[in-house]
C-alpha cells in the first residue's frame, strides 16, 4: 500500500494543486468585481483532457463557464467575419444555420458593435476594448444584448472594467495561467 501511494501521490497532488490554483485565482477575480453586477467567466482555453475538471474548478471559485463545447453555443470570431464578408453577415449566417443555438459575436470596434446590434445579436464579446470604449458600448447597447469584456484584462483592472457595466469578464488566464498551489501529503507510520 505504501509503495503504491508513493507512485501515485505526485500526479494526484499535481492535479489537485492545478485545480485548486484555478479555483483560488477565480475567487480573486470574483472578489475584485464584487458588487458590480459583472460575472467572471472562463474561456475555451483549457488543457486537453482536463476541460471538465478545469471548468469545475472555475465554478468552485465562484466563476461561470463560457461553454463546455461547440454544441453549447457558437462564437463568431474574426476569421468568420472575414470569411462571411462582415460581422453582421457572419452573425446572421450562424443564426440562420443553427437557430436554437446561442450565438456570441466577437467585435473589435464600436462600429462592429452597432452592426451586430442592428442584426439582432444578444451576446457580444468586446475584444481588447479600452475602458472608455467598454463604457460607450454599454451606453449604446442599452440592455439589448449581454456584453462580455475580453482581452487585455488583469486582476488590477478588473474592478474598473466591471464598473463600466459589462455583464461578463472573460478571463482565459483562469485556466491557462493560474498558479499551481503547493499541496503535499505525508505518509505517517502506523502507531
Enumerate the predicted regions with their spans:
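Short, charged, intrinsically disordered terminal tails
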Residues: 173-191
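Glycine-centered loop/turn positions within well-structured domains
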Residues: 132
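Short secondary-structure boundary segments
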Residues: 128, 151, 173-174
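Acidic/glycine-rich phosphate/pyrophosphate-binding loops and surrounding catalytic core
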Residues: 1-108, 112-119, 135-140, 146-148, ...
Amino acid at each position: 500500500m505504501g509503495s503504491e501511494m508513493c507512485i501515485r501521490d505526485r500526479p494526484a497532488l499535481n492535479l489537485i494543486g492545478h485545480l485548486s490554483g484555478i479555483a483560488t485565482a477565480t475567487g480573486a477575480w470574483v472578489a475584485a468585481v464584487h458588487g458590480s453586477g459583472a460575472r467572471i467567466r472562463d474561456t475555451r482555453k483549457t488543457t486537453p483532457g482536463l476541460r471538465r475538471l478545469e471548468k469545475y474548478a472555475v465554478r468552485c471559485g465562484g466563476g461561470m463557464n463560457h461553454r463546455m463545447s461547440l454544441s453549447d453555443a457558437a462564437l463568431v470570431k474574426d476569421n468568420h467575419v472575414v470569411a462571411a464578408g462582415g460581422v453582421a453577415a457572419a452573425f446572421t449566417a450562424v443564426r440562420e444555420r443553427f437557430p436554437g443555438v446561442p450565438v456570441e459575436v466577437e467585435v473589435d470596434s464600436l462600429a462592429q458593435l452597432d452592426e451586430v446590434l442592428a442584426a439582432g445579436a444578444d451576446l457580444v464579446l468586446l475584444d481588447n476594448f479600452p475602458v472608455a470604449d467598454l463604457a460607450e458600448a454599454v451606453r449604446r447597447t442599452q440592455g439589448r444584448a449581454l456584453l462580455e469584456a475580453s482581452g487585455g484584462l488583469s486582476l488590477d483592472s478588473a474592478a474598473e472594467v466591471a464598473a463600466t457595466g459589462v455583464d461578463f469578464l472573460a478571463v482565459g488566464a483562469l485556466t491557462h495561467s493560474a498558479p499551481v498551489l503547493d499541496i503535499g501529503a505525508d505518509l505517517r507510520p502506523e502507531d
